[in-house]
């Protein structure tokens, strides 16, 4: 039987950026709904993003990171200017 080398996926982090319009409640909701953060962790991360200007929501294979970022952007688009970045982990 021939063995195939399966490539390791490129890992990427999803980074949420702070802004002055998106509510804390929306950010916590997005962190819980799309990044599976427990309430307390989501609240701490939201405060960190507010204080530091950005924060890492999670690290995923590239395609999953893009999907999660797009889902959050789509949910935010109607009411908030929330921005997310996907950045390769080196």
Swiss-Prot record:
Coiled coil (residue ranges): none
Any one GO biological process: proteolysis
Gene3D superfamilies: 3.30.1390.10
Family matches, as Pfam families: ClpS
InterPro entries in alphabetical order: ClpS (IPR022935), ClpS_core (IPR003769), Ribosomal_bL12_C/ClpS-like (IPR014719)
Subunit description: Binds to the N-terminal domain of the chaperone ClpA.
Family according to the record: Belongs to the ClpS family.
Function: Involved in the modulation of the specificity of the ClpAP-mediated ATP-dependent protein degradation.
Protein name from the UniProt record: ATP-dependent Clp protease adapter protein ClpS
UniProt organism field: Helicobacter pylori (strain J99 / ATCC 700824)
Encoding gene per record: clpS
């Amino acid at each position: 039987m021939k063995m195939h080398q399966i490539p390791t996926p490129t890992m990427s982090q999803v980074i949420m950026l702070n802004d002055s319009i998106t509510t804390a409640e929306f950010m916590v909701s997005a962190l819980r709904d799309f990044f599976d953060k427990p309430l307390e962790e989501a609240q701490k991360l939201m405060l960190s993003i507010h204080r530091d200007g950005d924060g890492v929501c999670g690290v995923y294979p590239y395609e999953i990171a893009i999907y999660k970022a797009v889902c959050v952007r789509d949910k935010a688009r109607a009411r908030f200017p929330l921005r997310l970045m996907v950045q390769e982990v080196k």
